[in-house]
Amino acid sequence: VLTGDFSLENGYQLTRDLIAETRAGAGFCFNAVFTSNDMMAIGAVRALKDHGIAVPDEVEVIGFDDIEISRLVEPPLSTISQPGLEMGARSADLLLRMIEGKKPRPKTLVMKPGLVLRGTTRKLTEEER
């Protein structure tokens, strides 16, 4: 697990460093990158391609956000989508209750994310399963 700053540049740098460590014989190899957001994933894809690593054939990449640009990069980015409209509606409801002087009721809300498969991931072959 590497810590980043959610930027495209940092996604590129961290992936570049990971590639360098792997090639220097760090005792590990990797075949997938899962980032905290889509911008870092886009940076990771760029670093992999710049180092001659095929995405998704050699290394698969998945982001988190499903921002609009994730569909436009090459290959299109696989990602985890968040229920943004539902999150916004729940937040607005909570804010309105607070403005009206009503105490928010403590509760846990679970909103399900979705897996969006695009071009940076691939289906495993029977041999790979």
Task: Place the predicted regions along the sequence by residue.
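Short, well-structured alpha-helical segments in soluble
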Residues: Y12-F28
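Short, well-ordered alpha-helices that flank and scaffold nucleotide-derived cofactor binding pockets
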Residues: R16, A20, R46-D50, D93, ...
